[in-house]
Amino acid sequence: MCALVPPLFPNFGWPSTGEYDSYYLAGDILNNGGFLDFPVPEETYGAVTAVTQHQNSFGVSVSSEGNEIDNNPVVVKKLNHNASERDRRRKINSLFSSLRSCLPASGQSKKLSIPATVSRSLKYIPELQEQVKKLIKKKEELLVQISGQRNTECYVKQPPKAVANYISTVSATRLGDNEVMVQISSSKIHNFSISNVLSGLEEDRFVLVDMSSSRSQGERLFYTLHLQVEKIENYKLNCEELSQRMLYLYEECGNSYI
């Protein structure tokens, strides 16, 4: 019954030479140094030798060329020029970067090119000049205010010495924060000048709004002055000090009668 089963690998009628002979044959061929050992033509060896010699000669020529560059003054001068040019451009870029940082914040939002930086700077210079003019004007106004305040403090801190010797009388009444009504009474036999009072008040930054004068039967003169003073920070109008100041201007500084 088993004889009827065909063999797994039929030999097709060829005689068997052994179970593993073919494998040994293949191993011997692979281990043999002559496997794929085809003869190489002599022209191939010559070409390889020529390429090797050419590479060696090329390396020598490159090295010699480098030495020639180092010893060539024209090449050295050109290299130095290129280095100087790079340094010059680096400095210029640094200067334009500094100029760009001086522009307003709107001009620093993005990196401007060199022409754009120059154009924006030329437009910004007149703006700065206008701001400088405004600041100078504001400074002058502040100096005028400070000077007026000092003048006011001067006569407030230096009242007349001989108040009791004055012949005339002065009374001041406040009408508002910067308004006052002043009445002067004096004898007409004394040659006092009201113009000196007005000049002194003008120096003290008082403005004369209205003025009137009258004469009584008792040979006395009366002057009524309505004054305004410019508003100065931290300055409070003192009627008593103003009265003393006007007495000083009216009697001690008077030269003629008007």
UniProtKB/Swiss-Prot annotation:
Signal peptide annotation: none
Domain bHLH: 76-128
InterPro entries in alphabetical order: bHLH_dom, HLH_DNA-bd_sf, MASH1/Ascl1a-like
Transmembrane segment boundaries: none
SUPFAM superfamilies: HLH, helix-loop-helix DNA-binding domain (SSF47459)
Cystine pairings recorded for this chain: none
Subcellular location field: Nucleus
Record-level GO BP terms: cellular response to iron ion starvation; regulation of DNA-templated transcription; regulation of transcription by RNA polymerase II
Domain of life: Eukaryota
SMART domains, alphabetized: HLH
Keyword Ion transport applies: no
GO annotation, cellular component aspect: nucleus
Protein's recorded name: Transcription factor ORG3
Gene expressing this chain: ORG3
